[in-house]
Amino acid sequence: MKTNGQIQLYPVLRVALFLIAGIVSGELLYGAVSCDAWFAATAVSLMFALLAYRRCVLQTVLIFLTCYFLGAMLVCRELDEVNMSVPGEDTAYSAVVVSQPVVAGKVVKCDLITVNTHRPMKIKASIYRDWRADRLRIGNGIEAVSLLEKPTNYAGADFDYARYLLYHGYVATTFIYIDEWKGAAVDLSRLSVVQRARISALVFRDKLLQRFSDMGFNGQAYAVLAAMTLGDKSSLSDELKEEYSVSGASHVLALSGLHLGIIYAILSLLFSRRRWQIVSQVLILLAIWSYVFIVGMSASVVRSAVMLTVYSFVSLLNRNRLSLNTLSVAAVVILAGSPLYLYDVGFQMSFAAVLFIIIFYRPLLEVMPGSIRNIPIIKQIWQMTAVSVAAQIGVAPLIAFYFGRFSCYFLLTNMI
């Protein structure tokens, strides 16, 4: 079969591109075009696509239009959820702590989810510090009366902090004074199954972190160990983050694809018998998702687990595991579940890195003459170099755009 262009070799890539285009359009037109309008457009285009089964070209166009409208509808719906009306006045509410409380001067900062409002609200909270606030842990319930406000930007800041909070699910911010709250047992039944599961996972992770402290880890050693193994970066100091960022190794502290990939590779070596391939892949994926649950089901870890799951299923079909289609399937699954991930820096960087490895790894590998490249030690070093350079080609523009810097030590750091 002939194809009129290389892109037709990657059908899922086209679906992903139209879905992304729809998400971008839906976000830009939010407020001007309603979710109902996007839903109607999705339904109509899907109906015509089903009716046009005898006209392949027309049906293909209509399917892509359906993906476009679907992306717009999904992002519109998610924006509706985070753009809830906030009272803007002192409000009484019950909530549960859903992030590791962090001491910052005279306040303790943490995330709360309300459990007695019409819809649960995720709140970025600052609690005036006292002995009770210092003892707050993930999963603790509180009853409070405080001013709930929509996220706003800091005066004179270039970074759009309000947009960042909204796109990460925060509905409001609040400051809680000493006499405005008390600990309480709260009912979590109004929360979704996913929210309750995540809270349970975070409570379990908190117990594991306490084990690290009991074993004698403290200071920077504890902070790095907690970040690399359980994804808790709350103890990392700004100085330590800066050192890792300058050295080009900040990705080591962000529990994501690198760490899950190592776990997947080790488990694959342990379960390498070919005749038990299906069983071994199921066991490996169960282990991966169990780990995702233990570390709190953060966005970056879930994203990486989805990519590994797609990779695993593709390997069972004896297809090219690391291809544009595989990457596109992962993108479609993730964005269909949470379209605002598209605006997450971690999402953009992880997919850019994998995309450029797929595109540039082989050409970079062949830059070195085969007679030299086939020497075992040189081959291994050059393969690592090619992967690192290809990934950096993809993420360098994003790093420069978002952080205004680029590490020149990435090759040496990644080798180590």
Which residues fall in each region the model found?
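Alpha-helix C-terminal capping segments
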Residues: 49-52, 84-87, 112, 212, ...
